[in-house]
Amino acid sequence: MLISFFEEFPTPENLRKLKLVTWPTKLYLAAPSLQEFMRIKSGIRNKNVREFVYWPILQKKEGYWISPFSTRAALKRIFRELEGTKVPVMLDLELPTSRNPLLYLTQWGNFRKNKILISYFIQNYSGDIYTAEYFPKGSFGEAQLETLGVHYPVPKIKIIKMLYHSMHHSLSDGYLIRQLERGKKQWGKNFRVGYGTIAAGILGKESILAPEQLRHDLTLAQEKKIPEVVIFRLGGLNQEYANILKKII
């Protein structure tokens, strides 16, 4: 099982945490443009990072995350810069509720066109595509996510379901296991899971996952033969977490 990391804030301080990573890993780097992603990537010298994935983020006024409620100009900008490339890319498919809820009104007229635009990119991009997504409340929940344009059931993509135990304290072992089994059955080798959070994200108020809970959650993923777990985020890595990860690997 590959253990990888998201990094929403790829500052030198956060990237220095890579010194604790002694196993092959993958790094999902947030950046406002492909050019900035390439600049950050070029400055990282760590033989254990086997792959870098571009995680495009928008300005707050544009929606920050990718969804049909993001501004149309921002979506076109991100997709245009990736034309003709094969850079691995992760679309963080989340609604703008906590960053800019006004977009529900201002972008409603663009919703259908934006959804088609996102779908077209996902289906036609030449490189590897990952999508970070909410976990569904059953099959009906998955249909809701698809209707809202934050889930695209395209066979070629790799789907990362964000099962952040620290932010959803009601997640029981039984529920988590069902989500892992359901994802594996539906998406097979293209199913991934996101665990965390071990550091706050853009909201600044995310609860921190206890080390023992991380160990437990990772063990469940390993038992279900999930090919990759992505931890949010690298900047929260410390020696205690690193020791747990090394034992799991």
Task: Enumerate the language-model features and the residues they cover.
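Glycan-processing catalytic domains of CAZymes
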Residues: 1-249
